[in-house]
Amino acid sequence: MHLSNWLLFCSVALLVTFSPGPAVLLAISNAIAVGPRRAMISSMGNGFGLFIISGVAMAGMGVVLATSATAFMLLKLAGALYLVFLGIKQWRSKASIVAEAPVVQGAANPNSFWKLFRQGLTVALTNPKAILFFSALFPQFITPGEPVAIQFTVLTTSFVACAMLAHLFYANLARLLKTQLATPGRARLFNRICGGAFVLLGLSLLRLRAKTA
């Protein structure tokens, strides 16, 4: 994998992980309940779940790479279009990320490491969009002919690191700026910035594909 591909992947991963989703909302909820530091335990569980999902995605991707170059290119195209779809969806969203933070049933015990860990793991494994996203995104950065397992490990580790950074950011920000983040106007601006960036990245991936086809 070339350094330029990895840097582009990290840019996409940062946009994905910093865009509000179930794992981010869980980090916000736990940060309010038990503090940002303890909230990162649930983020560790989420990261572990992402490695499991990546393994499942890798198994399917290995079959695609081994059997059909055309299918591989179609999957890359689907990945780029999926980024555009996510961008449009994010742009149209008007909800406040803090206002939507879920109330964790049975308030987490600050001393219960495994309870927090299981929360994050469950959120990752029960998100039906996760494996679809991994299967659609990773082909954009996989180099055919090189070991798939190694490339998936590098990409997954990078993605999890970006996710942990995003969760740490939101956990601390939600604790300090809960009222400001709940303002509809600012929430709308945040969603549109993320959505526009998604669309631009998706279009750039389509252009890269056209040049290399």
Segments from the language model and where they lie:
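Primarily residues marking transmembrane-helix entry/exit sites
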Residues: H2, W6, N109-F117, A130, ...
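Membrane helix-loop-helix hairpins that form the core translocation module of multi-pass transporters
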Residues: R37-K115
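Core segments of transmembrane alpha-helices
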Residues: V123-S135, G195-F198
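Juxtamembrane helix-capping/reentrant segments at transmembrane boundaries
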Residues: G35-M44, G106-A108, Q119-T122, T183-R186, ...
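Selective transmembrane alpha-helices of multi-pass membrane proteins
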Residues: T67-V98, V160, A166-A174, K178-A213
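Juxtamembrane transmembrane-helix termini in multi-pass membrane transport proteins
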Residues: L3-M73, A136-L155, V160, A171
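Hydrophobic/aromatic residues within the transmembrane alpha-helices of Major Facilitator Superfamily
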Residues: L14, F18, F51-G55, I88, ...
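Short loop-to-helix capping motifs
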Residues: G21, G35, N127-P128, T183
